[in-house]
Amino acid sequence: MFHFLFSLLLLGSIHGEPIKINLITTNDLHGVIGKQKANFMNPQYPPTILGGAAFAKYVDELKIETEKNGEGLLILDGGNFFQGSPLGLVDNGYTMIEWMNRIGYDAMVPGIYDFISGAENLNELSTKATFPFLYSNLDCNNCPLINSNIKPYIIKEIEGVSIGILGVVNSQIMEFVLAENLSGTNAEKEVYSIRGWIPDMKSSGADLIIILTSSGVPWNREDEYEMFLQKISRGEIDETS
């Protein structure tokens, strides 16, 4: 899914002038970057979505524009990037990584479906990427996800602003992915990881922190939130920790 462009307006610390940083996010691409008909928009007369080629052209033009205007640009992906189409599955994600390298992504976080070909495959894909794979809540002491391009977070300096990007994997991965594909990977609850890493990121100089995740929102979010509040009231969760 290609998302719209967001712009972050920050106040410059030196002259008080606004700093503009453009943010592009994608998620759940599932290897679908070819031209296609948008039947979900109009089943009878579906418009054409030009896909990955048009997106690449758009990003190229935006890079020129932002550089000309003295603005920053950040491109992030929220995971589930290759499973779900023949293009993505034929080589277990390598073509998608090549396309993402061409776009110039700054970082991505793996989604649950990115483990469909196993943790070893995901580790190998990360070595081919020109951008880091981020996760902060996977316990990976004995799993294959151990190369130098896999990190809990990064801090990028853009237009004088230190932007921290923290990767958080959906903790339900333990329920939806076969144990043999996880290869010993265990997931910590998202909130505990976020609370643990943000102080470290701030002490490392992050002025602004972005949580990059494919956790989504549960369909029964009202019930889940009510259960969360009940656990706090029973002392099962320390909301101050």
Please name every model-derived segment:
Residues M1-S7:
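Sec-dependent signal peptide recognition
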Residues S7-G16:
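Hydrophobic h-region of N-terminal signal peptides that target proteins for export
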Residues E17-S241:
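Acidic, metal/ion-coordinating pockets
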